[in-house]
Curated annotation (Swiss-Prot):
<keyword id="KW-0498">Mitosis</keyword>
<dbReference type="GO" id="GO:0035859">
    <property type="term" value="C:Seh1-associated complex"/>
</dbReference>
<dbReference type="GO" id="GO:0051729">
    <property type="term" value="P:germline cell cycle switching, mitotic to meiotic cell cycle"/>
</dbReference>
<dbReference type="GO" id="GO:0005634">
    <property type="term" value="C:nucleus"/>
</dbReference>
<keyword id="KW-0132">Cell division</keyword>
<dbReference type="GO" id="GO:1904262">
    <property type="term" value="P:negative regulation of TORC1 signaling"/>
</dbReference>
<comment type="subunit">
    <text>Component of the GATOR complex consisting of mio, Nup44A/Seh1, Im11, Nplr3, Nplr2, Wdr24, Wdr59 and Sec13. Within the GATOR complex, probable component of the GATOR1 subcomplex which is likely composed of Iml1, Nplr2 and Nplr3. Interacts with Nprl3.</text>
</comment>
<dbReference type="GO" id="GO:0048477">
    <property type="term" value="P:oogenesis"/>
</dbReference>
<keyword id="KW-0131">Cell cycle</keyword>
<dbReference type="GO" id="GO:0010508">
    <property type="term" value="P:positive regulation of autophagy"/>
</dbReference>
<dbReference type="GO" id="GO:0005737">
    <property type="term" value="C:cytoplasm"/>
</dbReference>
<dbReference type="Pfam" id="PF06218">
    <property type="entry name" value="NPR2"/>
</dbReference>
<dbReference type="GO" id="GO:0034198">
    <property type="term" value="P:cellular response to amino acid starvation"/>
</dbReference>
<dbReference type="GO" id="GO:0005774">
    <property type="term" value="C:vacuolar membrane"/>
</dbReference>
<dbReference type="InterPro" id="IPR009348">
    <property type="entry name" value="NPR2-like"/>
</dbReference>
<dbReference type="GO" id="GO:0032007">
    <property type="term" value="P:negative regulation of TOR signaling"/>
</dbReference>
<dbReference type="GO" id="GO:0045792">
    <property type="term" value="P:negative regulation of cell size"/>
</dbReference>
Amino acid sequence: MHSHTNETAATSTTAGAVTNGAGGSGAGAAGAHGSTEGKIRCIFLSEFHATAGCKISCQVPDNYISKDVFDAINVYIIPKQHLQRCILTVNAMDVKIVGYPVGIQDQQKYARNAFLFNLCFVCDSRARSVQYEPVVKKLSEYLIMMEEESCFLSREDDKRRLQNIFETVLRDLNERKVATIVEGDNTIYLKIVMHKPDPPPVKDHMVPLLLANLRDAPLDNWDLTTQQILPYINGINHVARIAAEADVETDLVKSCIQNLVYYGVVQLLPILKYSNVYMTQNLKHLIQSASLSGACRKYVALRPDKTLPSVQRIFQFYASMTHGVTLRAICQRLCPQHHNIDERRMVIFGLQHRFIRCIHKYPVFTGSVPSGRQKMYTGLISFDEICCKTGLSPCTIERDIEKDTNVTVIWK
């Protein structure tokens, strides 16, 4: 079972057949909630009855969750008070149940001074369920309002109306991903928003680039780690350097940046080195789009107060990027700074808009028994990653590889 309030994990418990998962609505959540998109199989309302105890009072379709299954897991459906008003997901007995347990306190209305209930969505145990969590919470808050206004849930007379609501929600969310409920003067709109897949893991040698101007946002809007690392995210510093300069543990920095990537405010780039080789792709978009070429001219200008570089000059620079030609060689030949072009910002803009891509080097040890750094030359670890892991300069690694006749370099 996992639980969380908003985007922060609150409690995590494992007991018997109930599995432990990682709560959250951001990066990491999608994988934890299952691997396949699945329909809502059932919607039910459970409540704690004054004499009968924990029971299902309304269910669509009827008896989808059997009494035996419910009896085995009901301690997690109507949990202790500290787990109320937060999403709980129970994965047991071939079903996954997403709920939002609630307790309404009122000594005059209720026999036990409180009305405890939980609205639950049920899907297959291996189905992804994170997209249902905001809907469960919103519908639960709607039912809380209805209960406080007219005892809509606790009155037996209203159970048929509740069943009609569940039938509508189940059908419309499965078929159209949206549902509208009109009950008296109250209307509620529900919509399933599909979550993006998790971004790939962030590594030490990756370079984050801000895609939105977050520095202008009040720092109070961000968690402590983001506040600490934000000043060091500039499209040049790699993750390990950001962690060192911000004095934040590297794993925390990676987690924070992965979250920013998930929300689309950060893009990961390769380390910018003058020994890098780049290849062009989709370069025609720079010429075809006036707005894009205008943005590029402003972004790459070495001195924005001077005449902006021409699109033709920028295009010439990008078009010179080809296999076997380093950034250093291009700069020596074209002298971009003489034309008010900052070559580093030009590379960043090209990577960001996918005009160019970096060709990475992967050393491969071809001898019999590797030793020392040779153990890293597997063909799976890039040159940049090796430099970051060892703390050695690219020149040192280059010399090391050139002297070793048992090492071949693959470019890809």
